[in-house]
UniProtKB/Swiss-Prot annotation:
It comes from Paracidovorax citrulli (strain AAC00-1) (Acidovorax citrulli). It catalyses: GTP + H2O = GDP + phosphate + H(+). Belongs to the TRAFAC class translation factor GTPase superfamily. Classic translation factor GTPase family. LepA subfamily. This is Elongation factor 4. Gene3D superfamilies: 3.30.70.240, Elongation factor 4, C-terminal domain (3.30.70.2570), Elongation Factor G (Translational Gtpase), domain 3 (3.30.70.870), P-loop containing nucleotide triphosphate hydrolases (3.40.50.300), Translation factors (2.40.30.10). Required for accurate and efficient protein synthesis under certain stress conditions. May act as a fidelity factor of the translation reaction, by catalyzing a one-codon backward translocation of tRNAs on improperly translocated ribosomes. Back-translocation proceeds from a post-translocation (POST) complex to a pre-translocation (PRE) complex, thus giving elongation factor G a second chance to translocate the tRNAs correctly. Binds to ribosomes in a GTP-dependent manner.
Amino acid sequence: MNHIRNFSIIAHIDHGKSTLADRLIQRCGGLEERQMEAQVLDSMDIEKERGITIKAQTAALQYKARDGQVYNLNLIDTPGHVDFSYEVSRSLSACEGALLVVDASQGVEAQTVANCYTALDLGVEVLPVLNKMDLPQADPDNAKAEIEDVIGIDATDAIPCSAKTGMGIDEILELIVAKVPAPRGNPDAPLRAMIIDSWFDPYVGVVMLVRVVDGRLLKGERFKMMASGAAYNADNLGVFTPANEPRNALNAGEVGYIIAGIKELKAAKVGDTITLEKKLPNNLGPAEQALPGFKEIQPQVFAGLYPTEASEYDQLRDALEKLQLNDASLHFEPEVSQALGFGFRCGFLGLLHMEIVQERLEREFDQDLITTAPSVVYEVVKGDGEVIMVENPSKMPDQGRIQEIREPIVTVHLYMPQEYVGPVMTLANQKRGVQLNMAYHGRQVMLTYELPLGEIVLDFFDKLKSVSRGYASMDYEFKEYRASDVVKVDILLNGEKVDALSIIVHRSQSAYRGRAVAAKMREIISRQMFDVAIQAAIGANIIARETIKALRKNVLAKCYGGDITRKRKLLEKQKAGKKRMKQIGSVEVPQEAFLAILQVEE
């Protein structure tokens, strides 16, 4: 075990994490030259395109150090985005060390800070590395100062490197061998292994990536999950060098995969502990207690997904089920809307997660989707004291039956150059933010706010980028549910509620939002042969109204001169026809209308 080193790489998007991983793999001969491609560890197309890492991947590397010993280095790739923070914490808890990769030309960013704090909380040794030193605008001294200021770890011997040219790679490997502690764990205790990640493979079923903490697992042994108690046979074991390499046993301190013919990803939850099923003469039996830190992931943001053609409902369901095989944090359930027909209510970890799921549905499964405005989960206390969770605005009970509504509050860390503090604070205050803290680190400022999650999901991130010219970065974590004066605004077309257009907003903004949505609808819905009234209402109170005037045929065109009574007769006839039409006519709501809710602000 003394020759094993488990480490991961923490970096902000675009700071060169995947490229650095490629270099380390290449240096240790993990893949032959012909198998090397850019971003070896990012296996999904969308990961390579957006340059982000979503699922954890690993590589077991063999490195012959300068002291002549051969070390087994396990690189565990972590997702860098805040939506996937639970996956990050699981990846990090499987490591003893982490390389903090900072772009020497840009300095530290908010998400790096968030992941770095997670690592320090878990007791992981953090080693700073300055990447992109080949760029002419690299400023290593400033980057070091920022690391010390913001994160508070000593950066005097941070290693300068360039993943692109390969400079400094050997120094990084030596640093890992010297500074990262060997795995703590007891090879002679009962088996305990933590699931870092799991994904679905069409040939063998679920593949689990595990870090063995205590004991060992042999091929063919029966093991069980401690959270669910389900037991399976360890059919195949092995390690990734990124290509997979079968083994007969996984020992304490190692990171490897287990294939056990599991059909559903839900059975292999990330963060769960694996132990042996029962005591046999040749083993030590099951462990007493599970490894700490496991929690069920709760979706934070909900949206409705509907197929554009009603006949494609089944394909959409199949597509979602297939996605769920590889993404256990995606929740969905069938939902019916009067306006959009049959579809699904889906739960996501955050906005990036939602975008990625939508994009994968459209790209990998050829789905045409209508998406409703994202909403968050509210805790509603009804008149009789019963507490229900409402994640869909159209399911909100009537005002009269509600005692109070509690909305989710998150703690947000905003990180930006000091000249943008003013606009960012104005934005946070508009969104009902409460400032908790403000700290200067050199030229950078870190603001801490409490904000309602409902205000963030619509457009906060885009606005933040625009008021700070793209320099501000943010991350958020859930804090609590808090009572708040929020109301449901319904949109009515000719007196009929359109359920998919309902929104939940704070009372202080309800009139403004109602007017804005009504005005937007007026632009989008095409003119009919009769008047269309668009109204925004809270309960029975109408708070805004717009009217789309009817198109009129000129029925008087063929009367040249003539008596006024003749003209009046034709006009009355037209009026009667319009009135009848209005009673039976229905208004088509185009797809853009559902997206318009998101862009009301502009």
